Amino acid sequence: LVLDLSNPEVQEFVYKSVHDILKDNPQIAFVKWDCNRAVTNPGSTYLPADEQSHIWIEYGRGLLNVFKKVRDSHPDVHFMLCSGGGGRLDYGSLRYFEEYWPSDNTDALQRILIQWGNSQFFPSIAMCCHVSASPNHQTGRTTPLKFRFDVAMQGALGMDLQPSTMNEKEVIFAKEAIKTYESIRNIV
């Protein structure tokens, strides 16, 4: 179900839901705003019949309104926009987020093309690129840790690894790779 964000009452409901959680839990420092549901049956019970063709514009405006209100109310919370799945990534949205997640596909080989494509339009440093496990849980592909770090250094480096499952050699390599990334981050 996709909420009808062309409706100001729905916008207020979404804003208040997020705002109340953050207000009541001041220890929350990070929020990933996931947008994994595409609109498959567009229409609005709020918009008049002769404005149904405006749903995409009004939905977008409503979503941006919610983003703005949440950010204005919680300027110290770090927000990540997730476009994996629903494709919700544009400059209008990005101005309310420090970073974005370009795809739920974390296979390093496939991420090369995904990240390259994203970098043609959006700033690389805002693109979250994580080192994930090998074999990859989506493709089953086994890739060396160095390759996974090299690919993840194309944007904002992160790790989707459990350090407790890494051997000593991998931990040492990861620490060195992170130091290398920190020395080149200003170039990214």
Protein language model regions, located:
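Active-site neighborhood of glycoside hydrolase catalytic domains
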Residues: 1-146, 156, 160-171
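Glycan-recognition and catalytic regions of carbohydrate-active enzymes
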Residues: 160-188
